[in-house]
């Protein structure tokens, strides 16, 4: 099956607090989209590049200040945008991101930095065609972290995640769609796929009827 080209590509960002189910949804969406012939790339932030790796190390050691984390995050994101996001959407692919700039706004905002300034610092980052916000209460997110065998890091507390959740929900981004992620993975996937299909229906037009029919099947 030849890949179906999407005019101007498509950028899907999946957001939410830790334990919301972002990685699971990203993988499920990619599998579905690839199955109907859409070239699909899954990436994440922080990336596996040098800046992203440095940041993940700091999440364990806690040695970076919020301001230092912002600097590293922005360096990582600029490289991500230039090396992967822009080239892939430019060739008509679907790019699915497991976290993007709203995570920086929420997490660094929860650490006390001004949300408006954080949004302005990310003005260079392409805006998602659809931003899927998986919403769960912090107590559920933390429970899921423990259930998958992980240990919450120094920031993953009920209080901090509550502040992050509030910022996520308050962000005024035109493509943001909130999904109740307390539901099971199948229900969340179905809701997310429907929202992605809404954008594809506009992008692909009549030529995409077959693709949309397969996605709905």
Curated annotation (Swiss-Prot):
CDD domains: TMPK. Gene3D superfamilies: P-loop containing nucleotide triphosphate hydrolases. Its EC number is 2.7.4.9. It comes from the Bacteria. This is Thymidylate kinase. ATP binds at residues 16-23. Transmembrane segments: none annotated. GO terms for biological process: dTDP biosynthetic process; dTTP biosynthetic process; dUDP biosynthetic process. Keywords: ATP-binding, Kinase, Nucleotide biosynthesis, Nucleotide-binding, Transferase. One of its GO terms (cellular component) is cytosol. GO terms for molecular function: ATP binding; dTMP kinase activity. Phosphorylation of dTMP to form dTDP in both de novo and salvage pathways of dTTP synthesis. It catalyses: dTMP + ATP = dTDP + ADP. The gene is tmk. Pfam families: Thymidylate_kin. The keyword ATP-binding applies. Belongs to the thymidylate kinase family.
